[in-house]
Amino acid sequence: MTTDPISLLKRVLSSVEVKLILAWLIVVIATIFLDPGSTYLKNPGSTAELVIRNTVFLGFFALGSAVIIISGGIDLSSGAVIAMSATVFSSLLMLIDPEGFRAGEIQTWVVVVSVIGTLLSGVMVGTLNAWLITGVGLPPFIATLATMVGLRSFARGLIQAVTGNRSQIDFPDLGLRDSLKDVTSVAIVFLIFAGILWFVMSRTVVGRHLHAMGGNEQAAKLSGIRTDRLKWLAYVIGAVSASMVGIVYFADQGSAKPDILARGYELNAIAASVIGGCALTGGVGTIPGTVLGCLFLRTVIDAVNKIVGTGADVYEGMIVGIVVVLAVTFSQRGSGRISKPFFGSLIGWACIPVLGLMAGLSFVLFFREKEWFTATHAVLFGMLVLACLTGRAWIESRRGVKSGLFVTRREPPRKS
């Protein structure tokens, strides 16, 4: 049996992973040309280390979120689990060896016991989430939203109980900070973790059952799959992976601040999973795609930091939101799940000036401190976006959308 080379090439190029690699290359090349400091050219090593390090930290708990999404769930509590785990880890260190903690010399066995205790707390959180969903019958969104709020409150109360009404726990160094600076070692550990999850999700019965449950839970139940146990496994994997990140963050930063630590990280994890090809409806997604989604997201954020400069971190949430919207749009249009025109209704036409105005305002926010910036640039950019969207709406109104993002067809004339 021979394989048509053209068909094989189309199949390879249509994969999410290849598309992400191409998109990542485009972002890197664009950053090289737009970065006024030419950081990628002057300091390629340090820049690559920073991006890889941030990708690894995001990747650990994003992979856990991906498993949950593939199984048909959602987890809004991963950021709170990170904060709680850092708090539990630091509290165990302080309670087990108070003298060593004050002196800044924690014994190895104390660290090991604290790590095990923290990971067990992650198992408990995953079990709680699974019970709220399977036992109580709450939707995953509501169940994990409740634990997200509750865990941060619990972490604040735990710190006050352990420290005597302080709001954070500080520790100079656990001896791991230098190891965490070795990006190669950290990346290898992450790839091993990702490889294990890839094997489980793609080469085992459990992984196939998780995909099947995410695709159609009722059909999975009728086929004899124990969906409740699978949900427990998925949420435990998600919570334990977040607990690992909480331990690493405390070891790296030397401080547990549940009020601010990892706030909003759950959205980044979901964003990376969606960018990597995971469908929020469940049943679709890969571990390699999620890894590349993390790399792409962190590269985009790093590119914005370099191009915009001072204060770019303020716009990180906006960038993540835009990237997620584009990723989901391309995914749904490319798969043919949605063929409705973007601007085929009155609401769509009304949104065109809104998007043009937002584009102009975003231009002002990003580039207002640049020497070349004038208000005329922002107005022209907003008008350009407005013209492009209006043209797109006009094409849709004349032809109608068949499928895909820009694939159109002419509607046949109606018979009177």
Regions found by a protein language model. Give the residues of each.
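Alpha-helical transmembrane segments within multi-pass membrane transporters and channels
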Residues: E99-M148, G195, L292-L297
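Cytosolic-side transmembrane-helix boundaries in multi-pass membrane proteins
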Residues: M1-I29, G195, L222-R229, V300-S416
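Single transmembrane alpha-helix segments in multi-pass membrane proteins
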Residues: T31-L34, P44-F101, W131-L138, I270-P288, ...
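Transmembrane alpha-helical segments in multi-pass inner-membrane proteins
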Residues: A242, Q253, K257-V324
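Helix-loop-helix hairpins and the membrane-proximal interhelical loops
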Residues: D4-V56, R208, I247, A251-D259, ...
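Transmembrane helix-bundle core of multi-pass membrane transporters
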Residues: V112, P140-R203, W232, D252-A262, ...
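Amphipathic cytosolic juxtamembrane alpha-helices at the membrane-cytosol interface
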Residues: E217-K221, I225-I237, P288
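Alpha-helical transmembrane segments of multi-pass integral membrane proteins
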Residues: T31, R177-M213, R226, S241-V245, ...
